[in-house]
Regions:
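Extended catalytic core of nucleotide-activated donor transferases of GT-like folds
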Residues: 43-128
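Nucleotide-sugar-dependent
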Residues: 231-276, 283-291
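Conserved catalytic-core segment of nucleotide-activated headgroup transferases in glycan assembly
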Residues: 16-30, 34-35, 140-141, 147-240
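N-terminal pre-catalytic "stem/leader" segment of glycosyltransferase-like enzymes
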Residues: 1-71, 75-79
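Donor nucleotide-sugar binding/catalytic pocket of nucleotide-sugar-dependent glycosyltransferases
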Residues: 110-145, 149, 160-165
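A charged, aromatic-enriched C-terminal amphipathic alpha-helix characteristic of glycosyltransferases
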Residues: 20-23, 28, 141-142, 148, ...
Length: 357
């Protein structure tokens, strides 16, 4: 089959895409076009939804002449039914997912694309041949630090660290309080103005006394700044930082080990973004990060508060920051480039178009 038209079923709209839709789909579309593939968006919800009603999407795919349909992060009864309807109509299917295992979706589609080797490993052995890894591509490969500073950090002239998160953190994980010679800027999902103050009041009201005291200490700590994420500001903050932090609270798996906790299935996206900027990174070791960082060479791993203190102290040396930052960038820019990931995705699309699985 000569494949030309590829349909997409999305879990968020093009007008307001969630990060996974932007990175896994919209960033890939120009590369698909260059490869002679014509993308067609068959479905996009007004509000993000992983379990939308996909009735009539199969008919739309057939009407528009789609040879293959990619289902991005959608799952549930309607998504499984759609995959089966497409198969019955002779249309190949690919399930694109970044943060969970869904055996019914994997079984209903011709191939599954996941973002990490670890997420692939969580699937049953009998399904491994259907599962392919396409990482999140680095979105701003040109953005890079040009100055790693000459200071070692003092109380009066502290070094600057940046932590980029998709959450509205109410504490600095693991580290808790930065040393006197370091300021930390947390770029996250923070509200602004009156909405921010309302959120603080609501958070304080629901906390227990001990938690409330810790939160108040976090709020008044002059060495910690919390700012809202935006697509330009996040790169500005990273460019101004001396060090990047990714502290993750690795809580015990309350499910008894049958389901991996959310922190374990995180992609390496935030890590490679910071490394591509040329930042020396200290991170909590999680499965996806362990395949990227060579401890002490292109980044640091830290588990305990003591580990974090030792790694932070090592990066007070400006020469070490520069050396590690440059090594970090060199190790990820090609391997995790959008071009490289698009090549992998196109390879899967073409392979599925030529065979059953």
């Amino acid at each position: 089959m000569t494949l030309r038209r590829v349909g997409f079923v999305l879990c968020s709209s093009a007008a307001q895409p969630i990060p996974s839709t932007r990175i896994a789909v919209h960033n890939m579309l120009p590369f698909l076009l260059s490869a002679g593939l014509q993308p067609v968006v068959l479905f996009e919800p007004m509000q993000p939804s992983e379990t939308p009603d996909l009735t009539d999407v199969a008919a739309r795919a057939v009407e528009t002449g789609c040879d293959l349909v990619v289902l991005q992060k959608v799952h549930g009864t309607s998504a499984v039914a759609l995959a089966r309807q497409l198969t019955a109509a002779g249309v190949r299917t690919i399930y694109l997912v970044c943060d969970l295992t869904d055996v019914p979706m994997v079984e209903a589609t011709d191939a599954t694309v996941v973002v990490t080797e670890y997420l692939r490993s969580l699937h049953p052995a009998a399904l491994q041949s259907r599962i392919h890894v396409v990482h999140d591509g680095i979105e701003q490969p040109v953005a890079c630090k040009s100055d790693w500073g000459s200071g070692s950090g003092t109380r009066g002239c502290p070094l600057q660290a940046v932590l980029v998160t998709s959450a509205d953190l109410d504490r600095l994980p693991v580290v808790v309080r930065p040393p006197a010679w370091l300021n930390v800027c947390i770029v996250g999902r923070y509200a602004t103005g009156l909405r921010r103050w309302r959120h603080i009041r609501w958070t304080l009201a629901r906390q227990r006394p001990g938690e409330r005291l810790d939160y108040l200490r976090f709020l008044v700590d002059r060495r910690i700044e919390c700012i809202p994420w935006d697509s330009q500001g996040v790169y500005r903050e990273m460019a101004q930082a001396d060090i990047a932090l990714i502290p993750i609270e690795t809580l015990a798996d309350e499910s008894g080990g049958e389901v991996s906790p959310a922190w374990k299935v995180k992609s390496e996206n935030r890590l490679t973004m910071k490394m591509s900027m040329g930042l020396p990174v200290i991170a909590t070791p999680i499965p996806s990060y362990e395949l990227v960082i060579e401890h002490g060479v292109n980044g640091f791993f830290a588990r305990s508060a003591h580990d974090w203190g030792a790694c932070l102290t090592a990066l007070r040396d400006p020469a070490r920051r520069r050396e590690m930052g440059m090594a970090a960038r060199a190790s990820v820019t090609q391997r995790y480039s959008m071009e490289e990931q698009a090549t992998k995705l196109i390879r899967v699309i073409r392979a599925i178009s030529e065979s059953g699985h």
